[in-house]
């Protein structure tokens, strides 16, 4: 007798710098899908992608979820398959809806979304276009600019222009003519603050450019601003909904990777204490930003807000936001009256719309 439960394939890990974050997010998502509330709705098949991009079946995936760490060599069957995707693991044929819990390149950038699209199967989150545009900060910012959405001044740098001392100095001089210190140097295609540097002077700018260039050919350099960091969650496909607005507070100089994912290094204010009308503006901008880049399913839209100037800037969109214990996306929906268990259920249902 066929099962009445929907079979959900949760894909996690991935060949990116955010592999460990993906594992932590997957633990939360799988736990919520297998909760007492959802147990009669969903059957979960976990699939693990190792750091070389190889896809592994449920046996390996469950071990990784249990240990909360990347797979050890002895856990992977030999001989090892070639690097990268070769075929879907055993058991995948039963999957009805795919749930990618992948952060960074090869998971959040439209590549795995393209695979699911070719397979003709529904999946959680944005499609190829929305994922690709939102992942690449330069493409995303160009779309925001074309739509007239507010953002801080920024400039693009190509890693090919940093190959020798004279070129590097020329790039730095050009940036200094356009931006003031401090500024932030970012790889265009990484998330979770991986590879980002804050530059207060020419030397730090050059170091930051080299660091970003080691991770990505496309580099963004943004004007630093004195601002609060606010976030809004978006859910839905045909009709997008927004959560309350939350604020990230931290003692560090800026919201880097360690601050983002370490216990007691930051705290949240949900809802964020904001002047009348500001939350409504941010929620409206969040919807406009998602529509601008064709993002749907789920997204977290990040903002900068300067109260003294009453100015709001779009920072970025994350189409596969984290689901760790420190992640804002599920917390924002919890504060908006949607439990974690109901949230993952809605995401799976939305995938089939």
From Swiss-Prot:
PANTHER family: D-ALANINE--D-ALANINE LIGASE (PTHR23132), D-ALANINE--D-ALANINE LIGASE A (PTHR23132:SF25). InterPro entries: ATP-grasp (IPR011761), ATP_grasp_subdomain_1 (IPR013815), D-Ala_lig_Van_CS (IPR000291), D_ala_D_ala (IPR005905), Dala_Dala_lig_C (IPR011095), Dala_Dala_lig_N (IPR011127), PreATP-grasp_dom_sf (IPR016185). Pathway: Cell wall biogenesis; peptidoglycan biosynthesis. Mg(2+) 2 binds at residues 316, 318. Mg(2+) 1 binds at residues 302, 316. Keywords: ATP-binding, Cell shape, Cell wall biogenesis/degradation, Cytoplasm, Ligase, Magnesium, Manganese, Metal-binding, Nucleotide-binding, Peptidoglycan synthesis. This is D-alanine--D-alanine ligase. ATP binds at residues 176-231. Cell wall formation. It is found in: Cytoplasm. It is an enzyme of class 6 (ligase). Residues 141-349 form the ATP-grasp domain. GO terms for cellular component: cytosol. Binds 2 magnesium or manganese ions per subunit. Belongs to the D-alanine--D-alanine ligase family. GO terms for molecular function: ATP binding; D-alanine-D-alanine ligase activity; metal ion binding. Its main location: cytoplasm. Its EC number is 6.3.2.4. It catalyses: 2 D-alanine + ATP = D-alanyl-D-alanine + ADP + phosphate + H(+). The keyword Nucleotide-binding applies. One of its GO terms (biological process) is regulation of cell shape. Its cofactor is Mg(2+); Mn(2+). Pfam families: Dala_Dala_lig_C, Dala_Dala_lig_N.
């Amino acid at each position: 007798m066929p099962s009445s439960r929907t079979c959900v394939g949760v894909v996690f890990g991935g060949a990116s710098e955010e592999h460990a974050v993906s594992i932590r997010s997957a633990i939360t998502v799988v736990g919520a899908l297998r909760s007492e509330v959802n147990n009669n709705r969903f059957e979960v098949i976990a699939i693990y992608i190792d750091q070389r991009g190889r896809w592994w079946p449920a046996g390996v995936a469950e071990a990784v979820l249990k240990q909360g760490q990347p797979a050890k060599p002895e856990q992977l069957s030999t001989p090892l398959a070639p690097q990268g995707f070769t075929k879907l693991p055993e058991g995948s044929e039963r999957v009805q809806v795919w749930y990618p819990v992948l952060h960074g390149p090869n998971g959040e950038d439209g590549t795995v979304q393209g695979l699911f699209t070719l397979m003709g199967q529904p999946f959680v989150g944005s499609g190829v276009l929305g994922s690709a545009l939102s992942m690449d900060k330069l493409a995303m910012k160009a779309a925001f600019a074309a739509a007239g959405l507010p953002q801080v001044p920024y400039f693009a740098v190509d890693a090919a222009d940093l190959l020798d001392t004279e070129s590097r100095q020329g790039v730095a001089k050009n940036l200094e003519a356009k931006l003031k210190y401090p500024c932030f140097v970012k790889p265009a295609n990484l998330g979770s603050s991986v590879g980002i540097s804050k530059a207060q002077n020419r030397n730090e700018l050059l170091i930051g450019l080299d660091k970003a260039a080691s991770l990505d050919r496309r580099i963004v350099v943004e004007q630093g601003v004195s601002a609060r960091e606010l976030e809004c969650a978006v859910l839905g496909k045909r009709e997008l909904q927004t959560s309350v607005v939350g604020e990230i507070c931290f003692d560090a100089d800026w919201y880097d990777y360690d601050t983002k994912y370490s216990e007691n290094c930051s705290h949240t204010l949900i809802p964020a204490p904001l002047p009348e009308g500001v939350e409504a503006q941010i929620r409206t901008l969040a919807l406009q930003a998602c529509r601008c880049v064709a993002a749907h399913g789920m997204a977290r839209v990040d903002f900068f807000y300067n109260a003294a100037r009453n100015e709001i800037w779009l920072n970025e969109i994350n189409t596969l936001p984290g689901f760790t214990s420190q992640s804002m996306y599920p917390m924002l929906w919890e504060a908006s009256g949607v439990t974690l268990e109901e949230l993952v259920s809605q995401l799976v249902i939305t995938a089939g719309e």
